[in-house]
């Protein structure tokens, strides 16, 4: 993808928008991009509007199947289109972006920014309006990292989901133990540590007495054998055994998936090894944290004009929406979770 640095929201503040738009909703003659295309992306279709010097305004509809997207790409290339803009509509923009990113300057615009620009007439199609805003330089490009970073982001985000699922299964087991009145979680600091895991397996097999299971305690837990023995006395039924067995099998599956993801993540990080190691010199940032940081913000900090822009994009900078002493409510972006 050609790097996009031409049209930034900061270059054209809201106060200057009326200079580009007439009262009837049409743009005036101040054009920044000569030949552009606006895309209105849906789940099944993409509506494309092309405008520019030497080009008659035309609107065509394509399906989102790969072959049709390739025909869209060929059509735009033949017209000499240089810039393409689209809204960030759920996951639907991604396959379109992937097909078109080679050879064009792509602008993924926030739908709220497009909506907030004044002057739109009701009969103007979405794709045409996006194209007009694009050519007048009124669109702010969202940060879309390179393909390698996007793939790394998929891995780290999926790992976080699996880790959450793993924690949920462990909590589920503890609830089942509580339901059976087995209180080992109140004695063991880590129910799923070495000692705790062996005790749970022994409970599942049902062959050992409470005293024999308590003897599985290791390290400092040996001094708590009496407490453990008392905590193991409960009302454990076959139903509890079935529920815990199902959760344990799921835990093993999740742990295997996480191991596979970690191996694939290390492969993706090989080209960013210098940045990966540098991030780990920050106190509190370890391997997973460093991988997540690279996956979310990339390694090219030129994308962000300042540290303030980066913190704002990450959802970690509070807004300052106040006028005449009154604060205006506005939906804030969700902070990135590392």
Please describe what each predicted stretch is.
Residues 1-338:
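A detector of single, family-specific signature residues
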